């Protein structure tokens, strides 16, 4: 479930130069010029943040159940671009994509003009783990002097350093770049610990026997919510075609709400609609069960009684995390220069299309 500080780091680094050009010249494509197909539906492109997984499941459900069609939309779900979904949305290659407020903030400081219009995940799911067979690591302070399997982001370095220091360590560690997977890097003993997600890799570990010893960010001094996963679009689309944004958000919201209340059926839909991902139904069902039981998308009782609107952006939790990253000097601009001021979460998120 690669959505932020792990797998996206390479895409963020690779798109810096492109963003410099975008900041200077504006968006190269007009994503609001959506064409109508023969049935009168408006064609819309949604880009994955990584491989198909339960983070994306609501979009697949919305397409399968006809929610997009009912809204007058013909949605094409496409693979993530090499430069990342955020860059694709920023320059108009995709109308919408899955991302998170953390990434939106990072890209905004590099010149992107994008916003999150719906937040699916409401609490952190990142877990930082060693193999259970590694008896030298009993808590984060034992990461001191060990080797971190990383995708190369300043963000993950800041998180690990804070967790180690909160647990009484110095916050010093070596790093090795992950190859094909963090699991493989740890198993080959090229690294001692790495990052995973409880709702995806954590489920894989439980089901397929690779036992992990894991620690969570909130327990070790990392404030706010880093994992504010949701749907993004660009500022130009919001200003010039708000009706399109509202239709897409409303239909997508309906898809995620269905998945949250019908997790097994939604799992079957994801497996069917994303055949190239070769997902196992039992695994996807367990991932959804983890999401529902952990209330990762919000408290179902509050959603049902209307005291919480599904999809609301947690700008408070995001800002707490942004401020932490700024304190740790984890932000840089499009030229690689350190930025000491955190992005303002309230300026890169909107709930106006949820209503």
Model-derived features: positions:
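Short, low-complexity disordered leader/linker segments with a strong preference
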Residues: 1-43, 351-355
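Short, glycine-/small- and polar/acidic-enriched structural segments
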Residues: 33-179, 183-188, 192-199, 214-215
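Surface-exposed patches in mature extracellular/periplasmic domains of secreted proteins
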Residues: 77, 116, 175, 259-270, ...
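Pocket-lining segment of extracytoplasmic ligand-binding domains
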Residues: 102-103, 181-185, 189-276
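Short, surface-exposed acidic
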Residues: 170-174, 276-291, 331-345
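Secondary-structure end/capping motifs
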Residues: 241-328
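Conserved C-terminal helix/tail region of periplasmic/extracytoplasmic solute-binding proteins
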Residues: 315-355
């Amino acid at each position: 479930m690669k959505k932020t500080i792990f797998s996206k780091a390479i895409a963020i680094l690779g798109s810096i130069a492109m963003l410099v050009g975008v900041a200077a010249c504006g968006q190269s494509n007009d994503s609001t010029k959506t064409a109508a197909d023969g049935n009168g539906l408006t064609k819309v492109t949604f880009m994955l943040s990584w491989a198909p997984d339960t983070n994306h499941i609501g979009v697949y459900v919305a397409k399968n159940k006809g929610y997009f069609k009912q809204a007058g939309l013909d949605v094409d779900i496409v693979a993530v671009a090499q430069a990342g979904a955020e860059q694709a949305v920023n320059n108009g290659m995709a109308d919408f994509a899955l991302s998170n407020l953390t990434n939106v903030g990072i890209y905004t400081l590099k010149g992107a003009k994008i916003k999150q219009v719906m937040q699916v995940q409401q609490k952190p799911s990142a877990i930082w783990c060693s193999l259970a067979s590694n008896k030298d690591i009993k808590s984060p302070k034992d990461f001191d002097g060990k080797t971190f399997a990383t995708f190369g982001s300043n963000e993950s370095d800041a998180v690990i350093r804070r967790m180690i220091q909160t647990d009484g360590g110095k916050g010093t560690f070596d790093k090795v770049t992950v190859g094909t997977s963090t699991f493989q890097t740890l198993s080959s003993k090229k690294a001692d610990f790495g990052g995973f997600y409880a709702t995806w890799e954590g489920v894989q570990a439980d089901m397929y026997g690779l036992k992990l010893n894991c620690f969570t960010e909130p327990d070790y001094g990392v404030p706010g919510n880093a994992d504010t996963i949701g749907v993004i679009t660009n500022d130009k689309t919001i200003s010039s075609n708000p009706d399109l944004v509202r239709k897409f958000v409303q239909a997508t919201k309906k898809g995620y709400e269905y998945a949250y209340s019908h997790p097994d059926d939604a799992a079957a839909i994801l497996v069917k609609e994303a055949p190239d991902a070769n997902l196992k139904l039992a695994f996807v069902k367990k991932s959804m069960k983890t999401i529902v039981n952990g209330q990762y998308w919000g408290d179902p009782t509050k959603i049902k009684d209307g005291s919480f609107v599904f999809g609301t952006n947690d700008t408070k939790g995001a800002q707490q995390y942004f401020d932490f990253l700024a304190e740790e000097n984890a932000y840089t601009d499009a030229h690689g220069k350190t930025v000491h001021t955190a992005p303002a979460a309230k300026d890169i998120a909107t709930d106006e299309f949820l209503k």
